[in-house]
Amino acid sequence: MAERQNIFFYYHPDEEMDGKVKALKKISSENGLNVVENSSDASIIVSIGGDGTFLQAVRKTGFRQDCIYTGIMREGQSGLYCDFNIDNFDNMIHSVLHEDLEVRRFPTIKVQINGETPFYCLNEVSIRSTIVKTIVINVCVDGFHFETFRGDGMIVSTPTGSTGYSKSARGAVIDPLIHGFQVSEVASLNNNQYRTLGSSFLLNKDRKLELEILQDGNDHPIISLDNEASPIKRIQNIDVTMDETIIKTVKLKNNSYWERVKRTFL
């Protein structure tokens, strides 16, 4: 287990959480793990919070592929990325040390805005209007013009991200073993003059989605990358593809993806 000895904790500090993390660090050290203060030195990155904190941990630490991410929920929380509760951290340490875990590999999407440096998303990218006016987007798949969307916005999600914002927009929950990404509409405008598909659709991992923002007053839409807004202005084109970057997480052997979906929603 030498390659898994360095552990880093990512969390939002406050007085109560500082005390809990101090105790977690003590337990880690007592079990032979080396607590590090720089995430780049870690082979295990632990986020403490809900799914949102987990997404931030992955983004803030650079979508590393050479380490294991794991999520710990705070009291009373539930999540799809978090297998452990802050009150049973001892069980997590025992599972890590005795390899009573399974490694999951979550795909990411690559988002390129205006042809510039790409961003990566584990959950989804969304684009929304910032004014009281529909946003107009030409939607192309592999260079083929599929539709012209008018409405509040669009969401492009990974399979694991399908349980987030996309689901609230009537998107499907996608099995993470399916290699592809989902495109969902947010409040599309459909009448005798304007038509869109009116439903979510799923693209194969080899497809390229191109979104062209028509400049009709919506020059500064909100772009959200997972749970963080992008400061980019005057967005004209957004290209989305599946990426080869894979985020490795661990799960308890008796806690499947669909068990977590049921526990979260049903």
Curated annotation (Swiss-Prot):
Its main location: cytoplasm. Pfam families: NAD_kinase_C. Its EC number is 2.7.1.23. GO terms for molecular function: ATP binding; metal ion binding; NAD binding; NAD+ kinase activity. It comes from the Bacteria. It is an enzyme of class 2 (transferase). It is found in: Cytoplasm. Keywords: ATP-binding, Cytoplasm, Kinase, NAD, NADP, Nucleotide-binding, Transferase. Signal peptide: none annotated. One of its GO terms (biological process) is NADP biosynthetic process. The active site is at D51 (proton acceptor). The keyword ATP-binding applies. Its cofactor is a divalent metal cation. Involved in the regulation of the intracellular balance of NAD and NADP, and is a key enzyme in the biosynthesis of NADP. Catalyzes specifically the phosphorylation on 2'-hydroxyl of the adenosine moiety of NAD to yield NADP. This is NAD kinase 2.
